[in-house]
Amino acid sequence: MLIGSLVELAWGEIDSEPIIAKIASEEIKIISLTITEGGYKVDFNQSRSVFWYVAEGLKRRMEKDLPITILSCDNMQMNGNVARCAFMSYFEAKYPEVAAWAKKKVTFPNSMVDRITPVTKPGKVTDVCCEDFIQWVIEDNFIAGRPAWEKVGVTFTHDVTPYEIMKLSLLNASHTLLSYPAYMEGFRKVDAVMADERYRA
C-alpha cells in the first residue's frame, strides 16, 4: 500500500529551519503528532525537542495571528489534554508570550486511535504490519478548520471518552483475557494464538 499523504520530509537534526517554516506557514492548519507516551515528558534542557520546534513555529504564527490545532495521535487516554499540559508548561517556562497567545489560538483535541501495529524489528524498518481493523475518533475541536476526514472513516465527536471506555473494556480486556491461558501454553504472539482454532472459537 502506498502512503500518499507523505509528500515532504525534513530532518531537523541537519536543518531546523524547514520544519519551523512549515509550522509557521499560513497553509498549515494542523500539526499532528505521534511521539509515543515518553515524548510528552518535557525536558527543559533539551535544545531541540518537539516542544522547541513547535514553539519556534508558533512565535512566527503569532506575528500574523494564525491559529492552529495540535493533534496528538498517540495511544494514550485523553491525549489532547496530555499534549496541552506538556506544550503549555514548556511555553510558559520558555516562551511566555507564546503561552499567552496559545491559550486562545491553539486547540488540542483528544483522539482515540485503534489499530494494532506490532513493534518494528531492527532490519525491517520498511515493513509496517498491522491488523485490518481501524478506528480513529477525534474530538471536533479544530480552531483553524479541518479536512473532511469523515469521508474516509474518521468519527468526529464532542467527547471521545465513551469510545475510550469501550476500547479499554472490550478490546483491551479481551486481549488480556486471551493472553493469560495462551501464555501458559507457551504462546508468545497474539497472531499465533488466533491461528489456533481452540482460541479462535
Predicted regions and their residues:
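Substrate/ligand-engaging "lid" and interaction regions
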Residues: 1-201
